[in-house]
Amino acid sequence: VLKVVGTKLKQMSRDVDTPARYGGEEFALLMLNAPFDVAMRRADQLREALASNYLRNVTNGEIYGQITVSVGVAKHRATDSIESFIARADAALYEAKTSGRNRVVAEAA
């Protein structure tokens, strides 16, 4: 699953973006100079693209389920430290997970 997510994240990234694995099952995509609405749209496109993939047993083809992701989106501010930026993205991710999973949530205003 991690390989599928990482590959799809890289495929959907622009040349100026930086996709990365961040922690055990978490990924990050730094989108240079992207408007917030574009970042939100890209996150939802990624979520939809991954949901079209099914986990299958390689031996018998049995379907285990879809790949789902929860995404938190934050915008870097000029006054941000890396820690404050990541904290806002993590808070949005936590909200996505606790509000039903398989969704994209923007940072709190």
Residue ranges and their predicted role:
Residues G65-V69:
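PAS and PAS-like sensory/regulatory domains
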Residues G6-T7, V38-T59, D90:
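Alpha-helical scaffold within the catalytic cores of cyclic-nucleotide enzymes
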Residues G6-R14, L32:
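Short regulatory alpha-helical coupling segments
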Residues P19-R21:
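A short pre-motif secondary-structure segment
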Residues L32, M40-A43, K75-A108:
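Catalytic-core segments of nucleotide cyclases and related cyclic-nucleotide turnover enzymes
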